[in-house]
Regions:
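Solvent-exposed, non-transmembrane alpha-helical starts
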Residues: 31, 35, 59, 67-72, ...
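Extracytoplasmic
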Residues: 38, 42, 68-121, 156-160
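Short glycine/proline-enriched coil/turn segments at helix->beta-strand junctions
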Residues: 53-55, 66, 82, 140-146
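Membrane-embedded transmembrane helical bundles of large multi-pass transporters/channels
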Residues: 1-27, 126-316, 321
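Solvent-exposed, non-transmembrane loop/terminal regulatory segments of multi-pass membrane proteins
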Residues: 23-61, 96-111, 126-130
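Active-site-flanking beta-strand signature of metal-NTP-handling nucleotidyl enzymes
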Residues: 57-63, 116-120
C-alpha cells in the first residue's frame, strides 16, 4: 500500500511502450495460416504459389463498358504491383473478332447482358498485406462501373470493417459496464477508477502482443471486450471486500491492505481457472485457438494485477462519495 504512488507512475510509464507495441503489432487476416500444414487446402495453396506463381485471385464484374474500354482497363490493372495475370476475352483472341462467334457455352461463362467478367491473379498470398494494397489499387483503377469480388477482396473489406467497428463496440461495452456499476455500486466515482485501471491493462495486453510478431484479426476484435468482461468482476469483488474491511479499520490504508489479504487468494484461484480455460484453446489443431488463448490468458493475469493495484486508490475515491 505504501508504494502505491511509484506503482501508479510505473503503470503510466508502461502505457507509452504499450501504445507503440500495439501500433506495431501486425494483424493477420489469413485463416490459412492457422490451419494444419497437412491439410489439402494448405498444400494446394502452397503448390499454387510455388509451381505457378499464383496465390490470390479476384473476379471483376465490368458493367456497361465497351470491349475496347474493357481491354484498356485490363492493361491498367496489369500495371498494379503484384498483379501476375489478367484474363479476359482479349487474352484469347483479338477484340476486333466479335465475341458472339464464341460457342454459347464459353460466351455465357464470361458475359451476361451488358456485363463481362475479368479474372485477376496475383503473385502474393490471399490475405497478405501487399495483396490487400493491390485490391485497393485495382478498385481505384476500375471506378464505379466495376465490382471487385473474390476472397482477397472479401478479406480487404473485412479488415476495413473491423477497423471501423472495433472502437464502436468497445465503446458500447465500456458505457454499458460503466452504467451498470454506477447503478449498483455505492460510489459514483469507483466505476471510472475501475475502467481506467482495466483500460490500462487492456492497452498493456495489446502492446505486449508485439513480442508475438502478429495476432489474428479475430483475436484483436475480441480480446479487449473479453478482457473487460472477464476481469471487471475481480475489481468489484475486491471493492466489496474493501467496504467490509472499512467497517473494521478506521484507517483506509489498513482497510485496503486487509481487503487485499482477505480476497487475493480467492481472486487468484478464480483467475487461474479462467486462465486454464483459455490455455485449453492452445491445444486446438486450428491454431487460431492458440493465438486467442495466449492473448486472453495474458490479459486475465494482467487484469488481476490491475484490479489489485486499482484498489490501492479506492480510498481516495471513497472519500469523495
Amino acid at each position: 500500500v505504501k508504494y502505491r504512488i511509484p506503482i501508479l507512475i510505473l503503470a503510466l510509464l508502461l502505457m507509452i511502450p504499450s501504445a507503440v507495441g500495439m501500433a506495431k503489432t501486425r494483424i493477420n487476416y489469413d485463416m490459412l495460416d492457422y490451419l494444419p500444414e497437412d491439410m489439402d487446402t494448405v498444400i494446394g495453396q502452397n503448390d499454387l504459389m510455388e509451381d505457378f506463381g499464383k496465390g490470390a485471385f479476384s473476379f471483376i464484374v465490368v458493367d456497361g463498358m465497351s470491349d475496347r474500354d474493357v481491354d484498356s482497363l485490363c492493361e491498367r490493372i496489369k500495371q498494379v504491383e503484384h498483379v501476375e495475370t489478367v484474363l479476359w476475352y482479349s487474352s484469347l483472341a483479338d477484340i476486333t473478332i466479335p465475341k458472339e462467334l464464341l460457342p454459347d457455352s464459353i460466351y455465357n461463362e464470361f458475359n451476361n447482358g451488358d456485363s463481362t467478367l475479368v479474372a485477376v491473379f496475383l503473385d502474393s498470398a490471399t490475405s497478405a498485406d501487399v495483396t490487400m494494397d493491390a485490391i485497393r489499387q485495382i478498385r481505384s483503377v476500375c471506378g464505379s462501373q466495376c465490382f471487385v469480388s473474390g476472397m482477397s477482396a472479401l478479406v480487404t473489406d473485412l479488415k476495413d470493417l473491423c477497423e471501423e467497428e472495433e472502437p464502436v463496440y468497445v465503446g458500447i461495452a465500456v458505457l454499458l459496464a460503466c452504467a451498470a456499476m454506477v447503478i449498483f455500486l455505492d460510489n459514483w466515482l469507483i466505476p471510472f477508477v475501475f475502467l481506467a485501471s482495466i483500460g490500462m491493462m487492456i492497452l498493456l495486453n495489446m502492446g505486449t502482443n508485439y513480442f508475438f510478431g502478429e495476432i489474428s484479426y479475430i483475436t484483436k476484435a475480441l480480446s479487449a471486450v473479453l478482457q473487460l468482461a472477464v476481469t471487471m468482476d475481480y475489481s468489484i469483488f475486491l471493492w466489496h471486500s474493501y467496504n467490509e474491511q472499512r467497517q473494521l479499520h478506521s484507517d483506509p490504508k489498513d482497510a485496503m491492505a486487509a481487503a487485499i489479504r482477505a480476497t487475493l487468494t480467492s481472486v487468484i484461484g478464480s483467475s487461474v481457472t479462467t486462465v486454464a480455460g483459455f490455455i485449453a484453446l492452445c491445444f486446438m489443431s486450428f491454431t487460431l485457438g492458440k493465438d486467442l488463448g495466449i492473448v486472453m490468458a495474458k490479459g486475465v493475469l494482467l487484469g488481476v494485477i490491475g484490479c489489485v493495484t486499482c484498489l490501492l486508490y479506492t480510498s481516495d475515491a471513497a472519500d469523495d462519495k
